[in-house]
Amino acid sequence: MLRTVTSKTVSNQFKRSLATAVATPKAEVTQLSNGIVVATEHNPSAHTASVGVVFGSGAANENPYNNGVSNLWKNIFLSKENSAVAAKEGLALSSNISRDFQSYIVSSLPGSTDKSLDFLNQSFIQQKANLLSSSNFEATKKSVLKQVQDFEENDHPNRVLEHLHSTAFQNTPLSLPTRGTLESLENLVVADLESFANNHFLNSNAVVVGTGNIKHEDLVNSIESKNLSLQTGTKPVLKKKAAFLGSEVRLRDDTLPKAWISLAVEGEPVNSPNYFVAKLAAQIFGSYNAFEPASRLQGIKLLDNIQEYQLCDNFNHFSLSYKDSGLWGFSTATRNVTMIDDLIHFTLKQWNRLTISVTDTEVERAKSLLKLQLGQLYESGNPVNDANLLGAEVLIKGSKLSLGEAFKKIDAITVKDVKAWAGKRLWDQDIAIAGTGQIEGLLDYMRIRSDMSMMRW
C-alpha cells in the first residue's frame, strides 16, 4: 500500500495538467522615412524566412485591354532564368496574384535577409527591365497563354467562379479574371508591363513583408542599409468602384459529364463590421463531399435533402471579401443533372432560415468551424503564405488582427446578429448565377430569384 501511494505521489509531481500554449506570431508594422511600410511576423521556431514586396494592385487595377498583365509579371518573376539565379544564391522565389494585390517573395534560411533583399532589389525593383528582354517576355507569354487555355478547358469549378465575378460585377474592376483572357494576353506587349509597373509598383502602394525566422528590427535595418527604394508616386485609386448586379451567365456544354454552378448575393468588403458575421454564416452550411463518409455526418440541415435525393456531388459555401465589395454564396458540382432545380430550391430555402429560424446550436457550431479555419490559416507554418496574408491585410487595414482578436470578434456574434445580417444581405435580394456543363436543368433566373424569400404567415 505504501509503495502504491508513493508511486502516485511521485508521478503527480512530474505530471503536466496542461500543454504549453504556442505563441502566435504578432504583427509589427513600421513606416520608414522614405515612405516604405515594413510589416513582419517573427516566428523563432521557423526553419526559413521569407522577405518580399506586396503591392496593393491586382487584377482589379487592370482594364479589359491589359487584363492579365499582373499574371505576366508573376510568371516573369518566376521565370526559369530568374529562378536559376536565385537558386545559385540559395534562395527560392514565389509570387501570388489576386484581385486586390500581388506579391513577390524571396525565401531563404534564417540569417540571409541581406541576401534576399539584394536579390529582390537588384533583379526586380531596380532592374525590372532586365526581366523584360524580348526573349524572356515572349517565352513567358507563350507559357501563360498555355496555362490560361488549360484553365479554360479543364478547371470547370474555378472557371465558373471567375464567370460569377464577371456577371456579378459587370463593367467594374472586380469583373476581370485574375489570370487574364486569351484575347487580352495575346495582345500584350512589353510596354504594357512597363506602364503597369510605373503606375502601380510604388512605395505608397506597397508593403515590404518579413515572416518566419526574421526579426522586425533586423529587416528594418537591412532595408535602410541596403537602400531599398521603390519608385515614388501617388497611390493609385480605382476610377470606378465595384457594383453588384443581379444577373446570370450560362455556358451550356452537354459534352461535359457534370453541371458546375455558382450562385451568390453581394457580400461584405474586407473592412465591413459584418465581415466575420458573413464568414460565420457561410460556415453554418459549410462544405460537403458525397464521396467522403465523414462529410455526411456534419449535422447540417441542408444535407438531409441533398443526401436523401443525391442532389449533388459536392458543394462549398463561401464568403469572399474585397476592398469595395464581396460575394456570399455557394458553388456546387452535380452529376444528377435532372434535379438541379431541386438542389437550388432546397439550398435557397435553407438560406431563408438564416433570417427567420437559425438556431443557437448552428451558430455555435459555425463559430467553432470558423475559428478552426482561421487557426489553420494563421498558423500554417508556411512563411510564404503568412507573408501574402500579412501584406494583404496591412495594405487594406493598416494592420493585422491577431488570432486572439479575431476569435473575440467571432465569439461576440449572436443569433440576432446573423438574422440581422441575413435580413439585409440575403432575404429577397438579387443574385448572380454562373454555370457550365449540363445545365439544362438550371431553370429560369426569375424562378430561382423567387426562392430568395418565402411566405412567413
From Swiss-Prot:
It comes from the Eukaryota. The keyword Membrane applies. Its main location: mitochondrion. It is found in: Mitochondrion inner membrane. It is a peripheral membrane protein. InterPro entries: Metalloenz_LuxS/M16, MPP/UQCRC_Complex, Pept_M16_N, Peptidase_M16_C. GO terms for biological process: aerobic respiration; cellular respiration; mitochondrial electron transport, ubiquinol to cytochrome c; protein processing involved in protein targeting to mitochondrion; proton transmembrane transport. Component of the ubiquinol-cytochrome c oxidoreductase, a multisubunit transmembrane complex that is part of the mitochondrial electron transport chain which drives oxidative phosphorylation. PANTHER family: CYTOCHROME B-C1 COMPLEX SUBUNIT 1, MITOCHONDRIAL, METALLOPROTEASE. Present with 19300 molecules/cell in log phase SD medium. Component of the ubiquinol-cytochrome c oxidoreductase (cytochrome b-c1 complex, complex III, CIII), a multisubunit enzyme composed of 10 subunits. The complex is composed of 3 respiratory subunits cytochrome b (COB), cytochrome c1 (CYT1) and Rieske protein (RIP1), 2 core protein subunits COR1 and QCR2, and 5 low-molecular weight protein subunits QCR6, QCR7, QCR8, QCR9 and QCR10. This is Cytochrome b-c1 complex subunit 1, mitochondrial.
